[in-house]
């Protein structure tokens, strides 16, 4: 029995499908009884709990004879890293705590990137005692504001009643200072980065024994929110493109000592040929359904290398695919239509393109699958229930 933690999203669902299609018996965990992955035909047992892992996982491992555990959310990865060695013969297929800490900390990630020759955005880490106004006045705008390690600050922000923002943008020193003042009571401030032009490019690698055994890459076509967030529509990019950068991505992961799956995320400017490192996702990433549909199966590769002990490269012939996360993608087009600052022609072209993509034979979906349709209908039912609760 293999346990997949985090059946609540298309990421967990994709991991379930990859392993289940190869005949592995699966137990899935989700935060709620309506977790997306519980409806998959591949799931033999489901556990709904949001309690700390140490409170329920050891008993579950013993009860079901779990052979291996996979997870993707950062809070699960951190908890599982602490449990390594405490679950008997069960294999915990997550990074060790030290390397995970490196990829979660953007400053440490950028330092490793600089050592292997990867360009990183100019950045400023505000600290107590600095003259923020003077520093802000010296920056080039716009800038992106993000926490170098969100897990480190989540509890401190919550204690002050502040939301954890994934990323914010400022077009001027005044806007930046207003954002930074929000965190004065916490005594901690997010990282400020110069904005990098171009398009989102993700390079995905599975590392084993210091080398990549599987590679894939994609570019973002749309995201939600439009200013930067989750990839709502993306496209596979052939591996004969961006080859030199892929080699650098592998060198970066080797420099860190990474083992397992990771996405190295860039902003790529085709006009100049520049690549700027944004971050490393040291886990199964949000757009992994695209890799799955294109034939790059990273969850299976993790199991194949770590459990079956097969270390040969397994680069398949990849299909030309696009993948769509329908609800966020719909929110994207609604936001574009409502943005009166955009020319009407641009909004109309975006709408026509959005609708035409439903007829594109290359397009697959984050949730819907003819081979495993129940998660889609379970998700629709959950959406209806939430809407009814809001209306009552």
Question: Where would I find each of the regions flagged by the language model?
Answer:
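Active-site nucleotide/adenylate-binding loops and adjacent lid/helix of ATP-dependent enzymes
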Residues: 100-190, 209-211
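Glycine-rich phosphate/pyrophosphate-binding beta-alpha loops
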Residues: 152-153, 222-225, 230-231, 281-295
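Peripheral (often C-terminal) accessory segments that flank ATP-dependent C-N-forming ligase machineries
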Residues: 304-392
């Amino acid at each position: 029995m293999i346990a997949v933690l985090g059946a609540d999203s298309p990421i967990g669902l994709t991991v379930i499908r990859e392993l289940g299609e190869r005949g592995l018996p699966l137990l899935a965990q989700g935060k709620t009884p309506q977790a997306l992955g519980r409806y998959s035909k591949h799931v033999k047992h489901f556990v709904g709990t949001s309690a700390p892992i140490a409170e329920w996982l050891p008993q579950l491992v013993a009860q079901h004879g779990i052979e291996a555990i996979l997870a993707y959310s950062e809070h699960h990865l951190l908890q599982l890293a602490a449990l390594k060695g405490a679950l008997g013969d069960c294999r915990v297929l997550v990074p060790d705590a030290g390397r995970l800490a490196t990829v979660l900390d953007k400053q440490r990630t950028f330092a490793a990137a600089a050592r292997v020759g990867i360009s990183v955005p100019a950045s400023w880490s505000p600290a107590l005692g600095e003259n923020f106004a003077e520093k802000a006045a010296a920056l080039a705008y716009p800038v992106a504001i993000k926490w170098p390690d969100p897990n480190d600050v989540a509890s401190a922000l919550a204690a002050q009643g502040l939301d954890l923002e994934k990323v914010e943008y400022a077009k001027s020193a005044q806007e930046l200072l207003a954002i930074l003042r929000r965190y004065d009571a916490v005594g901690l401030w997010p990282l400020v980065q110069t904005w990098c032009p171009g398009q989102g490019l993700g390079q995905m690698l599975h590392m084993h024994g210091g080398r990549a055994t599987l590679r894939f890459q994609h570019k973002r076509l749309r995201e939600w929110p439009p200013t930067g967030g989750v990839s709502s529509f993306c496209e596979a990019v052939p591996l004969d493109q961006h080859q030199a950068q892929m080699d650098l991505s592998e060198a970066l992961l080797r420099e860190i000592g990474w083992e397992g799956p990771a996405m190295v995320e860039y902003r790529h400017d085709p006009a100049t040929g520049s690549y700027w490192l944004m971050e490393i996702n040291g886990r199964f990433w949000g757009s992994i359904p695209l890799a799955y549909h294109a034939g790059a199966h990273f969850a299976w590769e993790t199991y194949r290398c770590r459990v079956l002990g097969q270390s040969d490269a397994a680069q398949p012939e990849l299909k030309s695919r696009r993948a769509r996360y329908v609800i966020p993608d719909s929110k994207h087009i609604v936001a574009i239509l409502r943005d009166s600052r955009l020319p009407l022609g641009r909004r109309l072209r975006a709408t026509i393109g959005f609708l035409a993509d439903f007829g594109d034979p290359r397009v697959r979906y984050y949730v819907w699958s003819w081979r495993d349709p129940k998660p889609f209908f379970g998700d629709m039912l959950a959406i209806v229930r939430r809407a009814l609760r809001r209306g009552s």
